[in-house]
């Protein structure tokens, strides 16, 4: 049933995008509920009382929190279709390592690109580019991070792409000139229905980030 799975989310969240993609990769029907993060719903506060953050995946009334954990949960529960994590334990561990790298390194670096200015922004931009180059090196000449099949690391990373134009606008640089293979990977991912349906328009995200930046960077 469609209401068996509920996703509490916020449209420009690169973390929520992961869960949307994973559900669609598995063909799972779900009810999407947009959250107002300035006025969080009672359901969000009830289902994620520790962090009070989106996304929250609710399956048969039970919450699963943290996007990367949600992706693993979705892969395990709906295991009959489109495996997300590799079956080999070593390859699975490697995929988890790179997803963890994205969460620990990329998020903080990208935030400095759009939410700071001056020397701090330049340092953040340098870190951000180095992290993307590390990821591009790991991708190599493979179609996807795990090889021929779209999977866990791809899902962990692809949502950040929707923020790329905002990074470029506010930090005045070209991501494609720095990591062309990574952008080719982005274009390949966007051909997947699960991704295309789950990612918002990057221009709309840039408008959102423009407003958000005003709160962090006084003119």
From Swiss-Prot:
Q: Which residues form the GST C-terminal domain?
A: 88-208
Phosphoserine: residues carrying this PTM: 198
A GO CC term assigned to this protein in UniProt: cytoplasm
Q: Which UniProt keywords apply?
A: Cytoplasm, Detoxification, Oxidoreductase, Peroxidase, Phosphoprotein, Stress response, Transferase
PANTHER family cross-referenced by the UniProt entry: GLUTATHIONE S-TRANSFERASE U19 (PTHR11260:SF781), GLUTATHIONE S-TRANSFERASE, GST, SUPERFAMILY, GST DOMAIN CONTAINING (PTHR11260)
- Enzyme Commission (EC) number: 2.5.1.18
Record-stated family: Belongs to the GST superfamily. Tau family.
Tell me the compartments it is located in.
Cytoplasm, Cytosol
**Domain GST N-terminal as annotated: residue spans:** 3-82
Q: Where does glutathione bind?
A: 13-14, 39-40, 53-54, 66-67
Which coarse location class describes where this protein primarily resides? cytoplasm
Induced by what?
By dehydration stress, salicylic acid, ethylene, methyl jasmonate, auxin, H(2)O(2), copper, benoxacor, isothiocyanates and the pathogen Hyaloperonospora parasitica.
GO BP terms? cellular response to water deprivation; glutathione metabolic process; response to oxidative stress; toxin catabolic process
A molecular function GO annotation: glutathione transferase activity
What is the protein's known function? Catalyzes the glutathionylation of 12-oxophytodienoate (OPDA). In vitro, possesses glutathione S-transferase activity toward 1-chloro-2,4-dinitrobenzene (CDNB) and benzyl isothiocyanate (BITC), and glutathione peroxidase activity toward cumene hydroperoxide.
The cross-references to Pfam families, in alphabetical order and at most eight, read: GST_C_2 (PF13410), GST_N (PF02798)
Q: Which reaction does it catalyse?
A: RX + glutathione = an S-substituted glutathione + a halide anion + H(+)
| Name listed for the protein in its UniProt record | Glutathione S-transferase U19
